Swiss-Prot record:
Protein keywords: ATP-binding, Cell inner membrane, Cell membrane, Membrane, Nucleotide-binding, Translocase, Transport
InterPro entries in the cross-refs: AAA+_ATPase (IPR003593), ABC_SmlMolc_Importer (IPR050093), ABC_transporter-like_ATP-bd (IPR003439), ABC_transporter-like_CS (IPR017871), Mo/tungstate-bd_C_term_dom (IPR008995), P-loop_NTPase (IPR027417), PotA-like (IPR005893), Transp-assoc_OB_typ2 (IPR013611)
Keyword Membrane: yes
UniProt topology in membrane: Peripheral membrane protein
Localization: Cell inner membrane
Keyword Cell membrane found: yes
Origin superkingdom: Bacteria
Ligand binding (ATP): G38, P39, S40, G41, C42, G43, K44, T45
Reaction(s) catalysed by this chain's protein: ATP + H2O + polyamine-[polyamine-binding protein]Side 1 = ADP + phosphate + polyamineSide 2 + [polyamine-binding protein]Side 1
Identification of the protein by name: Spermidine/putrescine import ATP-binding protein PotA
A GO molecular-function descriptor: ATP binding
Gene name of the encoded protein: potA
Top EC class, one word: translocase
Amino acid sequence: MTTPLIEIRQIYKSYGNTPILNNVSLNVNHGEFLTLLGPSGCGKTTLLRLISGFEQPTLGEIFINGQCVNQLPPQKRDVHTVFQSYALFPHLSVFENVAFALRCKKTPNQEIRKRVFDALKLVQLESLAERNVKQLSGGQQQRVAIARAIINRPQVLLLDEPLSSLDYRLRKAMQSELKQLQKTLNMTFIFVTHDQEEALSMSDRIVVFNHGHIEQIGTPKAVYETPANLHVAMFIGEANIFDIQVHTVKDQDIVTNIEGIQLSCKNTGNYQVNEWLHLIVRPEDIRVWSLSEVEKTEGMLPGRIVDIIYKGSTVDLKVELSSGKIINASEFFDEDDDKLEYTLHETVWVQWLPGWEVLLPHEG
């Protein structure tokens, strides 16, 4: 079995009487793109600072390559951090910003030049080497910060919400570039974000945080499609949530009642009769039918369209059910498909196939 590059063992961190991290344990593998995901104040950036050495744990141990680093200062941990602010030297050129650490080590000039241009080439900035960083765009400044961080080829690159200040198009482009850079370097990246889309599109694994503890660790697919609890389901993407009670258990299915309609669901958790559950359906798994499109309505819920949002590639619908509950549906747009011509206040039927839902134990 491969030894993890980083081992986080039962970490606690408090500031005075305020707990920030509570019994956090985590392994990080060699060459992995791992994302720490969670809302503001959940402890993800604190964990990053503990790994880098800028903070010390109240209790617990951190190992890098099998060595406990609790007492090691940041410069001896072979990890580098890209901060949200980039922390560039505004009076220096791109070249000198990237070369700074090498000059501090009194590296020969010829070697500095080669290594700096190698790093700039990786982030596609070699043509701007002599430009002052104040003259660069936000995306270019971020690339400089990354080049400076990888100049010494650390084992781990820590990225603290580095894309948060970029506009949407640039952020999307940088997501792809960061992932490609990580693959090229075969370096371990630990990426902090509160943006679910970033986490899903970039990560090998996602660690979902909430109130200082880990809710779930898994691949993007696992975290999205099989959330461990209600918080994960609601935080990762959109979710329609129904509170249901198991009426009968039949083979591998359960039978329940939603909005007065009897529905069957896959019994994925060995749930029992009378047990209360959360039933979760993603908007993209809901199908919306006009009255003229269906003859048999068994297993369908009646509703009324109360909002239509055209997004180019998708049409998002808000449907009010008979109880007044609003659910969200998302359909891929096809301009040649008449089925996607919905009308505000139109009466419709909604459904999903058994197995497309997620069932979770009820949380009170």
